[in-house]
């Protein structure tokens, strides 16, 4: 692989280019009509069948029940059969962006009648899908070719008529092999993150499952922690600098995030300033899934407070035991025990006052806290590695395509 300049406009090569095994350059990229390398496939299904229904999304081709979370009921007459290794895309878009996905899931699958099915001939399918999904020039051109107002349509005829600079088949194969290795590495890392989180949930359930007091005595949460309501402020208090106000958006994956910060320029009493080892919790939100999200305040953070929809749980135990309890199923089962199917979008002090938790002796509790915190660090490092891999992939794609 070599960095190749194409700034003179004569040679069409990406900034990052592969070479032949003998070190020589591949031929320059040449303008090609997609219609020359696309072969449509038009077999459909009618009546009863045993095909899986797939959905094409920007996250890839997925089983419909995985995409929606449950099996959907549809009349599948006229759905398009998509053989293994063939490509599809949804021709309608709300923002002019389209996703091209290859069936690597099932030997017997169908997609909506709105999903055109085709295969690439004399071209590498993996390369072409990555190219169509990642090249800024491709995205821009396809958005222009799509027609419509609120929802635009990229017809199959328009797609086939589009022309792009493409490398020869041998170079496509090399780029595709490289991307497949990188994609496999990313998926392996993602699998590791999922496995670590699953194991952590198992640890939490094991530690915080003492409901009958056979192992440790239980206490009310209010006996070992204080609950502090957040700051109420008006839009006129918001400023470019001042006190940082922690909100639900500042909690991401169990840690603090500072991508979306709000500051207020007003006097904040000492009682409304966070301290090291505090637990910040989202206690009210329009989305129930966000209620109960927590993060540990890892260090002293001067000039930092929290919003009215948040709460600080301040432990009296001098360790992280309370933080881990607040992430356990034992805690959530008590908080939402009476919700049934109703949408409860807040946690009150009264609810927290009624929560109970097992309380081991000090030394045992510190061992538990250390074990769980060590595991949190493993998860954090694994997630950072995953993020770095995904950012590396994104940067490489910008340089691998013209």
Mark where each language-model region is.
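Short amphipathic coiled-coil heptad-repeat segments
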Residues: 1-24, 181-221, 384-402
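Short, solvent-exposed linear patches
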Residues: 171-174, 367
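Non-catalytic DNA-recognition/assembly elements of restriction-modification systems
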Residues: 13-45, 161, 169, 210-231, ...
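A short beta-sheet element
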Residues: 67, 78-136, 143, 247-248, ...
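Short, surface-exposed secondary-structure boundary micro-motifs
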Residues: 93, 178-180, 285, 371-373
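A short glycine-rich beta-alpha junction/loop motif
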Residues: 10, 109-114, 147-170, 303-309, ...
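Short coil/turn segments at secondary-structure boundaries
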Residues: 47-55, 144-145, 234-241, 338-339
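Sequence-specific dsDNA recognition surfaces
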Residues: 35-87, 222-234, 249-279, 302
């Amino acid at each position: 692989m070599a960095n190749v300049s194409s700034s003179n406009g004569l040679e069409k090569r990406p900034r990052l280019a592969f070479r032949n095994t003998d070190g020589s350059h591949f031929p320059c990229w040449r303008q090609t009509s997609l219609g020359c390398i696309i072969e449509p496939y038009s077999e459909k299904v009618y009546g009863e069948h045993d095909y899986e229904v797939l959905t094409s999304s920007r996250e890839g081709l997925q089983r419909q029940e995985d995409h929606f979370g449950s099996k959907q009921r549809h009349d599948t007459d006229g759905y398009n059969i998509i053989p293994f290794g063939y490509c599809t895309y949804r021709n309608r878009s709300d923002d002019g962006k389209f996703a091209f996905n290859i069936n690597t899931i099932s030997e017997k699958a169908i997609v909506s009648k709105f999903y055109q099915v085709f295969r690439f001939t004399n071209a590498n399918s993996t390369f072409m899908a990555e190219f169509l999904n990642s090249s800024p020039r491709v995205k821009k051109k396809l958005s222009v070719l799509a027609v419509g107002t609120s929802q635009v349509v990229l017809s199959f005829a328009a797609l086939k008529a589009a022309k792009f600079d493409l490398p020869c088949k041998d170079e496509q194969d090399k780029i595709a092999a490289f991307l497949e290795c990188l994609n496999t590495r990313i998926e392996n890392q993602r699998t590791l993150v999922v496995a670590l989180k699953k194991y952590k949930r198992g640890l939490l359930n094991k530690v915080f499952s003492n409901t009958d007091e056979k192992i440790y005595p239980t206490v009310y949460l209010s006996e070992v922690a204080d609950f502090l309501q957040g700051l109420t402020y008006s839009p006129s208090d918001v400023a470019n600098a001042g006190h940082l106000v922690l909100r639900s958006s500042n909690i991401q994956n169990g840690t603090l995030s500072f991508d979306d910060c709000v500051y207020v320029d007003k006097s904040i009493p000492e009682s409304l300033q966070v301290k090291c080892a505090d637990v910040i919790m989202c206690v009210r939100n329009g989305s129930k899934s966000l209620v109960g999200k927590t993060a540990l305040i890892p260090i002293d953070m001067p000039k930092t407070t929290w919003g009215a929809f948040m709460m600080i749980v301040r432990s009296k135990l001098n360790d992280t035991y309370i933080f881990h309890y607040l992430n356990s199923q034992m805690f959530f089962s008590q908080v939402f025990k009476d919700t049934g199917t109703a949408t409860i979008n807040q946690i009150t002090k009264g609810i927290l006052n009624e929560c109970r938790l097992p309380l081991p002796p000090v030394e045992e509790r510190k061992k538990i806290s250390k074990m769980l915190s060590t595991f949190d660090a493993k998860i954090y490092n694994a997630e950072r590695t995953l993020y770095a891999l995904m950012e590396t992939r994104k940067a490489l794609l910008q340089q691998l395509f013209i």
